[in-house]
Amino acid sequence: MCYLYRNAIELGLKRLIIEDSHIDSSKAFKIIRNKKHSILGLWNSIIDEVKKYVNMPDDITLDNLQQYIKAFHNFDKSSDLFRYPCDKDMSPYFIEPKKLDIENVAFCFEELCNFLAYVSSILNEIKDYESDMMVDMKDCYGIIL
C-alpha cells in the first residue's frame, strides 16, 4: 500500500510538470528523466510555479506539504523500499519488523494526492484562460503572441 501511495505522488508530480505547468515539453521531459523517482527533486522542479499561481499570502499549506514530501522522500529516496524486500546488493530493507501507523500514513498520502489534484486543476484553468486570451487578442486586435 505504501508503494502505491508513493507512486501516486510521484505520478502526480510528473503530471504537473508535463501537462499542467508552463514548462516547455522538452525541458519537462528532461526534468522527468533527470529526477527519475525523486519526489523531492520533482517537487523542487515545480515549486516556483506552484508558489506563483496557487500560494496565498500567509498560507502555510505549501510549508506543510513540503514537510510531507521531504519526509516521504527521506524515508524512500529511490522508490524501492516498499517495492522490493532488499536492495541491489541483496541487503534487506527491514531487518527488524517495522510498525507503521497506517491510518496516519494513509491520511498524509491522501492529503498530498488531493493537494496535487487541486494544483493540477488550478494550473490547467490558468493555461485554458491564457489560451482563450490569446485567441481573443488575435481575433479582436490581430495580435499574435
Where in this protein do the model-derived segments appear?
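Domain-scale activation on soluble regions of proteins
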Residues: 1-145
